[in-house]
């Protein structure tokens, strides 16, 4: 049996930066100040549980923080302006781990609003990134999730529209919706394609290639990870059996009956250790050889850690 690894897979630069910021902050203030994180630092169960064991307190709102001497970290998904202002009012020291690519969307949305545009956001309802983007502008943003949403859209001025997109959606994810928007509203403007999240597109391109050369795909990632679920969807859409797993303990050995080639990928918020443990498990339980898929992309993107850390 052969294991073929997707390339790239796992951590993107924005997730690595956020996790590094939290780890460095925790080390710096250990036993001195309580470290809080608003929501999950990234959408991965292993990462969150590991930091909880080290003493990090994850909160769902700033009201839960009674210790104003603590340090609050904003997650990689970003927050609204109101949340930022609330932390300042309470006098809480904040370290912002928002992904720079998410910050870029915040700035784009504000720029469009300042130029008088009515805004449309392509994204998923209730995703923390979407909440943050909506909270970065003063006027309401209309959320579009499906083609039907585009057809049902009611706007004030069809000639004065702009759109932005959630970063964890790739060009492929948004292509049809953007095309439908442009068909209905030919004057609509939006960000350059090069502004999309490189990591989302790269991982999706890789898993599509992987699905062509294997019998089954294991996607390492958490159930609440948007990009991990999309990797799963891309495999099943190509007629390949695929499973989204938090770690090796979720594997069912019956999955491998009649399988010769197993593909493995990981969502952008899944750490390498989870893939490594999965490979070790498969080595122990199956006779396997391991290779990396041909034609993959090596990512060299790095984001700076803020000086405050």
Curated annotation (Swiss-Prot):
This protein's pathway: Isoprenoid biosynthesis; dimethylallyl diphosphate biosynthesis; dimethylallyl diphosphate from (2E)-4-hydroxy-3-methylbutenyl diphosphate: step 1/1; Isoprenoid biosynthesis; isopentenyl diphosphate biosynthesis via DXP pathway; isopentenyl diphosphate from 1-deoxy-D-xylulose 5-phosphate: step 6/6
Residues that hold (2E)-4-hydroxy-3-methylbut-2-enyl diphosphate according to the record: 43, 77, 127, 167, 225-227, 269
Residues in coiled coil: none
Cofactor note as given: Binds 1 [4Fe-4S] cluster per subunit.
Residues that bind isopentenyl diphosphate: 43, 77, 127, 225-227, 269
Residues annotated for [4Fe-4S] cluster binding in this entry: 12, 99, 197
Sample GO molecular function, one term: 4 iron, 4 sulfur cluster binding
Enzyme class: oxidoreductase
Keywords noted in UniProt: 4Fe-4S, Iron, Iron-sulfur, Isoprene biosynthesis, Metal-binding, Oxidoreductase
A GO BP entry: dimethylallyl diphosphate biosynthetic process
Disulfide bonds: none
Entry EC number(s): 1.17.7.4
A Pfam family assignment: LYTB
Matching NCBIfam families: ispH_lytB, PRK01045.1-2, PRK01045.1-4
Primary role: Catalyzes the conversion of 1-hydroxy-2-methyl-2-(E)-butenyl 4-diphosphate (HMBPP) into a mixture of isopentenyl diphosphate (IPP) and dimethylallyl diphosphate (DMAPP). Acts in the terminal step of the DOXP/MEP pathway for isoprenoid precursor biosynthesis.
Protein name listed in UniProt: 4-hydroxy-3-methylbut-2-enyl diphosphate reductase
Gene name of the encoded protein: ispH
């Amino acid at each position: 049996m052969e294991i073929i690894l997707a390339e790239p897979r796992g951590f993107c630069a924005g997730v690595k930066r956020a996790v590094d910021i939290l780890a460095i902050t925790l080390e710096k203030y250990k036993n001195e100040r309580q470290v809080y994180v608003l929501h999950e630092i990234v959408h991965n169960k292993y990462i969150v549980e590991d930091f909880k064991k080290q003493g990090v307190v994850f909160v769902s709102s700033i009201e839960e923080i009674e210790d104003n001497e603590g340090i609050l970290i904003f997650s990689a998904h970003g927050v609204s302006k109101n949340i930022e202002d609330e932390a300042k009012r309470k006098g809480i020291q904040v370290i912002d781990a928002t992904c720079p690519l998410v910050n870029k969307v915040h700035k784009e949305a504000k720029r469009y609003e300042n130029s008088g545009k009515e805004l449309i956001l392509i994204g998923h309802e209730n995703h923390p990134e979407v909440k943050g983007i909506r909270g970065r502008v003063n006027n309401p943003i209309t959320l579009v999730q499906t083609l039907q949403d585009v057809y049902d859209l009611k706007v004030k001025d069809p000639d004065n529209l702009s759109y932005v997109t959630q970063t964890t959606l790739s060009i492929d994810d948004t292509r049809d919706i953007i095309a439908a928007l442009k068909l209905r509203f030919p004057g609509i403007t939006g960000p350059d394609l090069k502004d999309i999240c490189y990591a989302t597109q790269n991982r999706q391109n890789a898993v599509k290639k992987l699905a062509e050369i294997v019998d089954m795909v294991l996607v390492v990632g958490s159930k609440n990870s948007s990009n991990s679920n999309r990797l799963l969807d891309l495999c099943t859409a190509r007629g390949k059996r695929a499973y989204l797993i938090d770690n090796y303990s979720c594997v069912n050995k019956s999955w491998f009956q009649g399988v010769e080639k197993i593909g493995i990928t990981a969502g952008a918020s899944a750490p390498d250790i989870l893939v490594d443990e999965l490979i070790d498990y498969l080595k122990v339980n199956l006779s396997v050889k391991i290779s990396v898929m041909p034609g993959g992309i090596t990512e060299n993107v790095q984001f700076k850690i803020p000086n405050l850390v």
